[in-house]
Amino acid sequence: MAAPIVDAEYLKEITKARRELRSLIANKNCAPIMLRLAWHDAGTYDAQSKTGGPNGSIRNEEEHTHGANSGLKIALDLCEGVKAKHPKITYADLYQLAGVVAVEVTGGPDIVFVPGRKDSNVCPKEGRLPDAKQGFQHLRDVFYRMGLSDKDIVALSGGHTLGRAHPERSGFDGPWTQEPLKFDNSYFVELLKGESEGLLKLPTDKTLLEDPEFRRLVELYAKDEDAFFRDYAESHKKLSELGFNPNSSAGKAVADSTILAQSAFGVAVAAAVVAFGYFYEIRKRMK
């Protein structure tokens, strides 16, 4: 499929879609599953073959029925409502925009979003996403395949500060933090505490303490939330652009024109979302 023409009209549609996603995510308390959708569409990238990645292919039944994507049909259906109002926006852009907004409205860092991804109907083979039962070498194999680094592995793992695992989807149950609708560094704080009643630690979480370089970053992020936010924003942007080469001048213009408005609105919405966080159990099926 052809890449979209990122002109003034397309950028206006992106702005409108961003606004609608903010409202949707705040009202439905669905930030965790929107972030998961963005990650899982992007996380299939293979740098060597240049296949997979954030191309919207996860919308196809062949891919969203992969075991690792269990439950993501909820997020796909929610995005369809936004797509119907803004048909010019590609699914690839929409899913990554949803992930950026999910972090933003729950109090996380601003992530620069550059549109222009093209859609694909070619689905990668199952098995490219991380297996939660594996150790640190598996994480390196998966992330290095995408062209990402150790810092990216640990920073992106911090995204588990949002949401919870569901046994019918992954075989695991429970949230990683006490406030699973708040994006902060508590994932790392809880990880260093060890086992805590009611909180989840996957094998892929625990293994971050077994490798010296991973542990160094865990300890840094646990004590310095600003460092975590800075590195997370950088790593999330890298993940969202795997295999995507935006025009540099257009990308800079988009970033410069949106980051200030994104920042100001995000603070207000984040406060509202966090305030309602205690009701997450009522709406947990929407995560």
Curated annotation (Swiss-Prot):
Catalytic-site annotation from UniProt: 40 (proton acceptor)
Segments of this protein annotated with the region Disordered: 46-66
Compartment list: Peroxisome membrane; Glyoxysome membrane
Membrane-traversing stretches: 259-279
Site (Transition state stabilizer): 36
Entry's Gene Ontology molecular function annotations: heme binding; L-ascorbate peroxidase activity; metal ion binding
Entry binding sites for K(+): 161, 177, 184
EC number annotated for this UniProt entry: 1.11.1.11
Positions bound to heme b: 160
Subunit structure: Interacts via its C-terminal region with AKR2A and AKR2B.
Family to which this protein belongs: Belongs to the peroxidase family. Ascorbate peroxidase subfamily.
Function: Plays a key role in hydrogen peroxide removal.
Listed name of the protein: L-ascorbate peroxidase 3
Gene from which the chain derives: APX3
